UniProtKB/Swiss-Prot annotation:
Family statement: Belongs to the diaminopimelate epimerase family.
Organism: Burkholderia ambifaria (strain ATCC BAA-244 / DSM 16087 / CCUG 44356 / LMG 19182 / AMMD)
The EC number(s) this enzyme carries: 5.1.1.7
Superkingdom of this protein's organism: Bacteria
HAMAP family per UniProt: DAP_epimerase
GO molecular function, one term: diaminopimelate epimerase activity
Transmembrane annotation, as ranges: none
Catalytic-site annotation from UniProt: 76, 227
Gene Ontology CC, one term: cytosol
Pfam families: DAP_epimerase
Designated name of the protein: Diaminopimelate epimerase
């Protein structure tokens, strides 16, 4: 079967986008997702994004995300920015702001005149059971309004903030993110037994109260050039710990994101993420190949 696709990226976090809205697509198997995402034998991407008709009231579209390992996941902020650019460029909507159904609710995406996209990422969740994160037997320590948790990583203790942005994140502050062994520790944290659904591992360097550098080892994808939910989780943890003030500029290997959160006043406030979205190319691929 010939499959039309669009290759996009948001700050270097790259995606294969499929239009299941204009016409229904057959369900993709995990093996087919892995084949499409393969950088040597397929198109190549961190994630595959599927645009569909919504199944709940109040939504304009449904947005599904599949990691390059074939598994479906809850949320992807960089992908959300590409999503709204895709539906706008394809003429699927004439709205500048759309409501989109994701696995755990609705999000609002707004395409600005300068081409950047603002995403209402929702409120962060810090309750360990809702991340989910097993803290049984652990002694946390308070820092600001946050609780840091000790995590055994390869025999060393790492103090993390556990945050859900609709998907699970473990955030730690490091002195030098470029020198830090992200590729060694990332997979150990991602698959740590205390995270039953695995976890995205974030490594944040504080530059100033309004600026950080961030690397994220993503669940099911490895280290990516940028991670939108990871940026939001890191900023929320930093503000809650008293280390950062909103808005925060987040520098990733793929580009820069701006995160705003009024969490110092109201932890139920939504995080707002602004950043780029770009189309790289379009094409067709034979799924049977």
């Amino acid at each position: 079967m010939k499959l039309s696709f669009t290759k996009m990226h948001g700050a270097g976090n790259d995606f294969v986008v499929l239009d299941g809205y204009s016409r229904a697509l057959p369900p993709l198997t995990e093996a087919q997702v892995r084949a499409l995402a393969n950088r040597h034998f397929g198109i190549g991407a961190d994630q595959l994004l599927l645009v569909e008709k919504p199944t709940v009231d109040g939504a304009d579209f449904k947005y599904r995300i599949f990691n390059c390992d074939g598994g479906e996941v809850e949320h992807c902020g960089n992908g959300a920015r590409c999503f709204v650019k895709f539906v706008s460029d394809r003429g699927l909507t004439d709205k500048r702001s759309v409501r989109v159904q994701v696995m755990k609710g609705l999000i609002t995406l707004t395409l600005q005149d300068n081409g950047e996209v603002v995403v209402d990422m929702g409120a962060p969740v810090f309750a360990p059971a809702q991340v989910p994160f097993d803290v049984s037997g652990l002694d946390g320590r308070a820092e600001g309004r946050d609780t840091l948790w000790p995590l055994d990583v390869g025999g060393a203790t790492r103090w993390i903030s556990a945050v859900s942005m609709g998907n699970p994140h473990a955030v730690q502050v490091v002195d030098d993110v470029e020198a830090y062994p992200v590729l060694e520790e990332g997979p150990l944290i991602e698959r740590h037994a205390r995270f039953p659904q695995r976890v995205n591992a974030g490594f944040m360097q504080i530059v100033s109260r309004h600026e950080v550098k961030l690397r994220v080892y993503e669940r099911g994808a490895g280290e990516t050039l940028a991670c939108g939910t990871g940026a939001c989780a890191a900023v929320a943890a930093g503000i809650r710990r008293g280390l950062l003030d909103s808005p925060v500029t987040v520098h990733t290997h793929g580009g820069t994101l701006t995160i705003g959160w009024d969490g110092a006043r109201d932890e139920a406030a939504a995080l707002m993420m602004a950043g780029p979205a770009a189309t790289v190319f379009e094409g067709e691929i034979d799924l049977t190949a």
